[in-house]
Amino acid sequence: MKRIIIYIICLISTITVYAQSSVRGDQAPRHFVGKIYNSQYDIYIHMDLENSSIIVPQQEIFGKIPGYLGDNKDSRKWLITNATITSDGKASLSIINDYGSEDLKATLQMLNDTTYILLQESGSTIKLARNRKWLKLPQKLIFKKDTKR
């Protein structure tokens, strides 16, 4: 009888452990996590600036990084090598191309829950391959978080 009571207590305690939520109420919202898109240039940013847990597909040699800028029409990536969240809604980024030959400093600013602005501040300009030519992106790019994807 004593064993049965001990087993029941152990069973009840394990059930209550699984009932605990992994998200605490005191955690701040995670604004700089996920994918954001720019439909004009057909590019996206896959990011986790808070934990640096992104692995670039087919380029795993770089390890875990804060994120990358990808292109839906080309396999080249621009890697976010360092990210510092400076204030609520702003992050300073260090970005390099996947060859390591070009780098720049940029700021990613969150305007609202679905709109972000990437400002290229100093260094090289982000370039994409389009129609066998390099296309320089503007200094200011607007990205949207698509909740449907």
Where on the chain are the PLM-derived regions?
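Bacterial Sec-dependent N-terminal signal peptides
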Residues: 1-25
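Central antiparallel beta-sheet cores of small beta-barrel/beta-sandwich binding domains
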Residues: 21-105, 125-149
